[in-house]
Amino acid sequence: MAAMASFGALALLLLSGLSCCSEACLEPQITPSYYTTSDAVISTETVFIVEISLTCKNRVQNMALYADVSGKQFPVTRGQDVGRYQVSWSLEHKSAHAGTYEVRFFDEESYSLLRKAQRNNEDVSIIPPLFTVSVDHRGTWNGPWVSTEVLAAVIGIVIYYLAFSAKSHIQA
C-alpha cells in the first residue's frame, strides 16, 4: 500500500512538472511576410495570410501561438521548419476595408489571460501581446466598370448599325 501511495505521488509530481508551464519566449525576433487577396472578381472572400519566422533569445522552439485580429482569435499553425508559423483568416469583401490590420500574437499564458478578460467583459487592450505584425491591405479590385461582354455587345450593335445604314445608302 505504501508503494502504491509513493508511486501515485511520484506520478503526480512528474505530471505537475511536465504541465506546469511552457517556457516563455524572451525577446522574440520575427521576420514577417503576408499576403492579402487583391482581386474580388475571382474570389468570394478576402483572404489574409501571415507567415512569420520566430526566434527567441532563450531558444524556445515549437511554442503554441494564438493570433488576435480586431477582437477575433485564431490558432496559429506551426510550419515544418523550426520557428515558422502561419495564421490565416478571411472576411467578406464588404467587411475587408483597405488599411492596416494589427495582428497581435500571444503565447499560451497571455492567451489564457486574454480569454479570461473577454469572458469577464474586461479591457483586453491591457494584456500585452508577445509581438504584433501590421498587415497592409490595399483593398480589392472589383473588375472594370463595364464588363467585356457588355462592351463586345455594344460594339457589335454599332457595327451592325453602321453596316445596315451603309447598305441603305448604297441601295438608295
Curated annotation (Swiss-Prot):
Transmembrane region(s): 144-164
| Membrane-topology descriptor | Single-pass type I membrane protein
Q: Which GO terms describe its cellular component?
A: endoplasmic reticulum membrane
Q: Which UniProt keywords apply?
A: Disulfide bond, Endoplasmic reticulum, Isopeptide bond, Membrane, Signal, Transmembrane, Transmembrane helix, Ubl conjugation
Stretches assigned to the Cytoplasmic side: 165-172
Covalent link Glycyl lysine isopeptide (Lys-Gly) (interchain with G-Cter in ubiquitin), residues? K72
Please name one Pfam family that this protein belongs to.
TRAP-delta
The disulfide bridges present are C25-C56
User: Per the record, what ranges lie on the membrane's Lumenal side?
Assistant: 24-143
Query: Which N-terminal stretch is annotated as signal sequence?
Result: 1-23
Keyword Signal assigned to the entry: answer is yes
The answer to whether UniProt assigns keyword Nucleotide-binding to this entry is no
Q: Where in the cell is it found?
A: Endoplasmic reticulum membrane
Per its database record, what is this protein's job?
A: TRAP proteins are part of a complex whose function is to bind calcium to the ER membrane and thereby regulate the retention of ER resident proteins.
Q: How does it assemble?
A: Heterotetramer of TRAP-alpha, TRAP-beta, TRAP-delta and TRAP-gamma.
Family affiliation: Belongs to the TRAP-delta family.
Name this protein carries in UniProt: Translocon-associated protein subunit delta
Source organism: Mus musculus
Organism ancestry: Eukaryota, Metazoa, Chordata, Craniata, Vertebrata
